[in-house]
């Protein structure tokens, strides 16, 4: 039997108080049961390794391509790419690979269509992996102040080829802008001062829910988001080990958002 979900859920929940720990363990248990049922259908280790490598290389190649979309790569965009590598806690060998991939993506002859087609094949049946890929690209663009101009429509086209709609991309951007969604902001640890009403509105965005939703719909939205970003599930589907930290941060943000809404509603 798997216990990682319960442990992760409980530890994160403890930061929210005793009740948060209980809720975290219960939901973690549900995710663990779901993952146990999936184990029999998981691809063999060598296939997961291939998926992981494809995902890693595509992440930084496409990041380099998007950084060059306006004709040049600024120092800010280079710093943003390095911030991605730092937050993902890559070792020196992986950093060098990431730099090589980023540089390859900047080249005039880079085959974006081929890269995306290969990634789409690797992630077939794994929409949560594709969403993590989109989130990382948006966060990098936010870090480099590079999401406006030609980058946004180009990023939407990239996402579309992977099955992510412009509406979903807008949702991702809205969520990542909460509490400063860039990699540089996350590493700096500073948070903007916002009102309680704004915090609550942001919490609904994190869950992709609305204030008018019924309590049971809020709980369903919470569980859906928690399952989508669960580190164990993503890792089992081929997410590189180096990118699990991103999933953990999103999971904590989801739990904090639900706890705020739960307290306000008295769920």
Model-assigned labels for residue ranges:
Residues 1-65, 75-229, 233-267:
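Small-residue-enriched hydrophobic alpha-helices in membranes
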């Amino acid at each position: 039997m798997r216990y990682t979900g319960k442990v992760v859920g409980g530890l994160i929940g403890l930061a929210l108080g005793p009740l948060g720990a209980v809720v975290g363990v219960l939901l973690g248990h549900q995710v663990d049961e779901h993952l146990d049922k999936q184990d029999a259908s998981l691809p063999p280790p060598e296939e997961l390794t291939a998926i992981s490598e494809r995902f890693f290389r595509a992440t930084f190649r496409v990041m380099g391509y998007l950084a060059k979309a306006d004709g040049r790569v600024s120092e800010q965009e280079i710093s943003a790419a390095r911030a991605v590598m730092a937050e993902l806690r890559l070792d020196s060998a992986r950093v060098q690979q990431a730099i090589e991939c980023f540089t390859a993506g900047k080249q005039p002859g880079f085959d974006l269509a081929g890269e995306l087609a290969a990634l789409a094949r690797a992630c077939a049946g794994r929409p949560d992996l594709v969403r993590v890929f989109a989130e990382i690209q948006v966060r990098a663009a936010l870090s480099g102040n590079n999401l406006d101009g030609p980058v946004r429509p180009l990023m939407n086209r990239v996402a579309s080829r992977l099955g992510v709609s412009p509406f979903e991309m807008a949702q991702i951007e809205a969520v990542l802008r909460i509490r400063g969604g860039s990699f540089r902001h996350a590493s700096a640890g500073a948070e903007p001062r916002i009102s309680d009403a704004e915090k609550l509105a942001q919490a609904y965005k994190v869950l992709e829910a609305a204030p008018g939703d019924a309590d049971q719909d809020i709980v369903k939205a919470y569980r859906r988001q928690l399952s989508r970003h669960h580190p164990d599930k993503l890792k089992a589907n081929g997410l590189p080990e180096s990118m699990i930290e991103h999933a953990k941060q999103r999971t904590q943000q989801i739990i904090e958002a639900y706890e705020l809404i739960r307290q306000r509603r008295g769920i």
